[in-house]
Amino acid sequence: MARLVGVDLPRDKRMEVALTYIYGIGRTRANEILEATGIERDLRTRDLTDDQLTHLRDYIEANLKVEGDLRREVQADIRRKMEIGCYQGLRHRRGLPVRGQRTKTNARTRKGPKRTIAGKKKAR
């Protein structure tokens, strides 16, 4: 099993898909990486040579922020917004949607399960 930046890549998947198992790399970025390193997209992870694996590892470490570094940066950005008190920071602090979605209905993922209000009756 190939290991890149602390992630075990699945052996039987094509490289284009296998790279997306790394946090911070999607399909587009995976294709850019493979093109830059000269590795075929259709090549399976199990068929990679040690040389190709080393080349991939060096390219990713030199040019991209992935996994732990990226997660830390995102968390730091959220924390900074909360500290300066901007609108997005307030939404994060209150656990509400940040990017303008409606909250009268829906938004259950961010708000959590419904809380029933005692004494409130449905209108007929």
Swiss-Prot record:
**What InterPro entries would the database entry show?**
Rbsml_uS13_C, Ribosomal_uS13, Ribosomal_uS13-like_H2TH, Ribosomal_uS13_bac-type, Ribosomal_uS13_CS
Q: Some GO term, biological process aspect, for this entry: which one? A: translation
- Where is the region Disordered? 98-124
**One Gene Ontology term, aspect cellular component:** small ribosomal subunit
Presence of keyword ATP-binding: no
Q: Which Pfam families match?
A: Ribosomal_S13
Listed GO MF terms: rRNA binding; structural constituent of ribosome; tRNA binding
Keywords attached to this entry: Ribonucleoprotein, Ribosomal protein, RNA-binding, rRNA-binding, tRNA-binding
Q: Which cysteines share a disulfide bond? A: none
Q: Does the keyword NADP apply?
A: no
- Which superkingdom is the protein from? Bacteria
Similarity section: Belongs to the universal ribosomal protein uS13 family.
- What does this chain do? Located at the top of the head of the 30S subunit, it contacts several helices of the 16S rRNA. In the 70S ribosome it contacts the 23S rRNA (bridge B1a) and protein L5 of the 50S subunit (bridge B1b), connecting the 2 subunits; these bridges are implicated in subunit movement. Contacts the tRNAs in the A and P-sites.
Q: How does it assemble?
A: Part of the 30S ribosomal subunit. Forms a loose heterodimer with protein S19. Forms two bridges to the 50S subunit in the 70S ribosome.
Q: What name does this protein carry?
A: Small ribosomal subunit protein uS13
Record the organism: Mycobacterium leprae (strain TN)
Whichever gene encodes this chain, its name is rpsM
